[in-house]
């Protein structure tokens, strides 16, 4: 598919939502409906020295811009590709004497592009940045205060020789960033590393049970010949069959919240009241709050356990932030034990604890206990998420890897195969995560064949292999959730 080609969609007025996009042809699961390059994008302030400012990949060794000493790149190819967007920024940073925050940098990049190309539609865009929603009129007192600070800082940073924009227009751009900023992740999809504006994506409306997902692809510059390079882009991918004329939707937030909580988040962050079927009917809310059936606990017991779980999660967050991982495990075990006679395995409080416990225990290399919690977590997720949900796929992948580390080769292989099937739909076969998962799938398949042929020899060979190479340690647990689709200023 040509990036920027939009023949598969058209803009229409969606009832109760304003503008939206609908399909002009039929699509099936895993189809890429459109791909779009960022209009403008920047790396987060905290990662400017660790992430390429062109492709947003994490690298150990990056080349620094020799002039401003701020921008970092994988290599000369990425640096050359970045120059058009970095040229004005480079001069402005040198003159300003310091690096402004990511919001200021992104606003400036957008306006330098407007200065170069005008305010009309650019190639492949169905909407200009001028016509994107800003919701400035809905900002609360604190947001208005932050906006004034951002505008003042921007005016100090913006070069006097560049085109001068009105205060109203500058405020509009900051509003656009606030409402339409899309989170950019690293090449493994595990960490949010930046934020970008994708105008066409801004036309896709929300649904808590969507028919599409959005995936960030960092592109590939590794080939010797530039003709084989692929560009950094987002891809809108179908999660199942989509009929011609059907509205295209994505979920702006994680589904695993009560409908009332999702609606509250959406109202606060995106200024609209969600009227999707799952919110109107409270679908799956009963599972999110499910209690044991036999014997069924009283409402008072359930209420007390909810409060106890909330208090424990607060203690866990504090312990995690301080790196006290053994304390985290202790708190999880105690709370899960108390929840056992009260909550069912789809209860959100159970699932949150299972997720934390499996992640932290994997990091501590206590794989046997971690694998038990991971299996319970996946069983619960499978009853709640859409079968092709990207977050489900990532969770199943991690659970499969944990079970493989624990020596549960059959369970681990089964989970990795399941995760691979999901990620083929949500990420596509060429995404780095999917490629990693394919390598894992092939390895576990080979080991499973050996296991079935001679279980004793398999365990002897596995033990020898693990003794002769460093154990792969899971990433250190983070308090940060998995990267959300849309970026909100903290």
From Swiss-Prot:
Impact after mutating residue 95 to R: In strain: C57BL/6
Zinc finger (MYND-type): 52-90
An MF annotation (GO) of this entry: histone H3K4 trimethyltransferase activity
Keyword Cell inner membrane applies: no
Function according to Swiss-Prot or TrEMBL: Methylates histone H3 at 'Lys-4' (H3K4me). Acts as a transcriptional repressor. Essential for cardiomyocyte differentiation and cardiac morphogenesis.
Family: Belongs to the class V-like SAM-binding methyltransferase superfamily.
Name recorded for this polypeptide: Histone-lysine N-methyltransferase Smyd1
Lineage of origin: Eukaryota, Metazoa, Chordata, Craniata, Vertebrata
């Amino acid at each position: 598919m040509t990036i920027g080609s939009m023949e598969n969609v058209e803009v229409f007025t969606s009832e109760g939502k304003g503008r939206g996009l609908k399909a002009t042809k039929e699509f099936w699961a895993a189809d890429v409906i459109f791909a779009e390059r960022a209009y403008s994008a920047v790396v987060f302030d905290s990662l400017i020295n660790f992430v390429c400012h062109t492709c947003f990949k994490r690298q150990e060794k990056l080349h620094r811009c020799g002039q401003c000493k701020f921008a970092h790149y994988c290599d000369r190819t990425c640096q050359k590709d970045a120059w058009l967007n970095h040229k004005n920024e480079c001069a402005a940073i040198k003159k300003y004497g310091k690096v402004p925050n990511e919001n200021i940098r992104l606003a400036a990049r957008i306006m330098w592009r407007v200065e170069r190309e005008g305010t009309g539609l650019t190639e492949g865009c169905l909407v200009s940045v001028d016509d994107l929603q800003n919701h400035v009129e809905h900002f609360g007192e604190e947001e208005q205060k932050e906006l004034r600070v951002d505008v003042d800082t921007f005016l100090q940073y913006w070069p006097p020789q560049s085109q001068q924009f009105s205060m109203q227009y500058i405020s509009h751009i900051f509003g656009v960033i606030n409402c339409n900023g899309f989170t950019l992740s690293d090449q493994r999809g595990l960490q949010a590393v930046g934020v970008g504006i994708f105008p066409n994506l801004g036309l896709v409306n929300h649904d808590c049970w969507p028919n599409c997902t959005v995936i960030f692809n960092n592109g590939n510059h590794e080939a010797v010949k530039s003709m084989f390079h692929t560009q950094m882009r987002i891809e809108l991918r179908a999660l199942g069959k989509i009929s011609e004329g059907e509205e295209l939707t994505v979920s702006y937030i994680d589904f695993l919240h009560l409908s009332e909580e999702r609606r509250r988040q959406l109202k606060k962050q995106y200024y609209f009241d969600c009227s999707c079927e799952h919110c109107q009917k409270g679908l799956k809310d009963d599972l999110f709050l499910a209690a044991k059936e036999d014997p069924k606990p009283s409402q008072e017991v359930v209420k007390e356990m909810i409060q106890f779980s909330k208090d424990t999660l607060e203690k866990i967050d504090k312990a995690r932030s301080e790196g006290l991982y053994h304390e985290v495990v202790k708190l999880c075990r105690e709370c899960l034990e108390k929840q056992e006679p009260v909550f069912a395995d789809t209860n959100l409080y159970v699932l949150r604890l299972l997720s934390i416990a499996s992640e932290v225990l994997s990091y501590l290399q206590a794989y046997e206990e971690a694998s038990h919690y991971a299996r319970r977590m996946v069983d619960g997720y499978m009853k709640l998420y859409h079968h092709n949900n990207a977050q489900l796929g990532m969770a199943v992948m991690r659970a499969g890897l944990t079970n493989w580390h624990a020596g549960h080769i059959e369970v681990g292989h089964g989970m990795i195969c399941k995760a691979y099937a999901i990620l083929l739909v949500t990420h596509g076969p060429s995404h780095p995560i999917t490629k990693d998962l394919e390598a894992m799938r092939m390895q576990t398949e080979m080991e499973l064949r050996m296991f079935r042929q001679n279980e004793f020899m398999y365990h002897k060979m596995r033990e020898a292999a693990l003794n002769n190479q460093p154990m792969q340690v899971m990433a250190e647990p983070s308090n940060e959730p998995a990267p959300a689709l849309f970026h909100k200023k903290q």
